[in-house]
């Protein structure tokens, strides 16, 4: 019996909506990353983008467990000497919650062309309003 290899033109994409309110950031991000990769489908093929589109709402209400809000730092570098910028997650979530969630998911995806293609299928919104009503997204209940 031969192994099945998905072809890009045969992939059927669905739209899912996830409510991130009062759920841990890492748990939501890992499940969203898995759906973006297509690992929930029996037709998953590592070198083909078989994933679905995901809309995440209420990202400003996401939770970090323990003391991570104050102790964990979001870092980026300006590429100049001494250009390391660090801010605690409490400030980062208050200023730009969409970026914090997208970064968490991006770091869980492959770091190449395919990973960037997968990340384009992620739509993140602060609040419960989104403008993807026409796609008729299914509500996705997360496993944990």
From Swiss-Prot:
Q: Determine the domain of life of the protein's source.
A: Bacteria
Query: Biological process GO annotation list?
Result: negative regulation of translation; translation
Report the Pfam families cross-referenced here. Answer: Ribosomal_L13
Keyword terms, alphabetized: Ribonucleoprotein, Ribosomal protein
Question: What quaternary arrangement does the UniProt entry report?
Answer: Part of the 50S ribosomal subunit.
Give the UniProt family note: Belongs to the universal ribosomal protein uL13 family.
Designated name of the protein: Large ribosomal subunit protein uL13
Q: Which organism is the protein's source?
A: Clostridium botulinum (strain ATCC 19397 / Type A)
Quote the gene name from the UniProt entry: rplM
